[in-house]
Amino acid sequence: MTNQYMQEEDDAILKTYNRYPVVLDHGDGAYLYDPEGKKYLDFSAGYAVSSLGYNNKEFNDALKAQIDKMIHTSNLYYNTTCGKAGEDLKKITGMYKVFFTNSGGEAIEGAIKTARKYAYTKKTGRYEFIAMENSFHGRSMGAVALTGHKEYREPFEPVMPGVHFATYNDLDSVKALVNDKTCAIILETIQGEGGINAATEEFMQGIRKICDDNGILMICDEVQCGMGRSGAWFAWQQMGITPDIMTMAKAIGSGVPVGAFAMTKEVAENSLVPGDHGTTYGGNPLCCAAVSKTIEIFEKEHMLDHVNEIAPYLTQKLQEIVDTCDAAVKVKGRGLIQGLQITKPIGEVTAKALEEGLLIIGAGTDVIRMIPPLVIGKEQVDEMAEILKKALA
């Protein structure tokens, strides 16, 4: 059956992914299974999406109940779940207004439009962005323009003009790019695709000051590093700053496709109005029910406390690999978005781990990304470490 499923996809689906030769059928907790029942420990969580793990009964029951009521209705009408989900996100972000999207890429596009509209409303004439080298903000055209990897932009040029790239964690490089056309500075609080690079508190606070001093908006992209993964609801909350706009997606719906961008009162009252932006599916009853139930379970299960308890153990086990394995160089990141820098080819290591029943993915050119479901325990960390040692040997 496994080969049949792979052949069906190869025949029907446009090849934009280099898939591993495994078919996933179902999951439970931090584990996934193929159709024949082979078990895999998941340390990728669907690219940091499945934070509650798989087959969470309370979450599943909430979705089933909402499906029985209504999945979708037009944004021309109010529904019973959108407002609550928005309030739930306001509570954990401290933001003033929220707009629901279907993905992180759409959230980035909304943030771009919000920043541009704010500049238009304020009659500043500003339209340019400063983004970071090695950043990743998505696959849509605006998001690609902000992504600091030339290989992602080049095939689609000309992309959105007026984007300049600074060096991450280097305030002087940011200051050198600021001009009277800069409308926003955008960055990931922890770079995921770029190699698990965490912004320093000094850098984040410096960006905030640059923005305040120059009338520029600060946008934090928390699509991958947000929703508890850093040990706080959102990683910027550990930095002593508040952005003007933030983006989120992935884990906020625990696997249901939903994203959002949120903003302060100042931005909300001077940016998007009816006719400026919209979405067909965003804010639909099913996705919003998923957001609210995810947040409810996070709070009930004290998920942030759990992340802060298990993350140092993950760091310890990764450091032990560095100390004992010639191919391991350095541990990066924090919380449950960590990375192991290695000297062996990423593809070789991930393939060997897959054979041993461990799902891991790369970040950048030389980092193994550790973004497991947030529900993992020490026993799963131990299991991962043993398999990874074999894969690096």
What is each model feature region?
Residues 1-393:
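Conserved N-terminal phosphate-binding loop of PLP-dependent enzymes in the Aspartate aminotransferase
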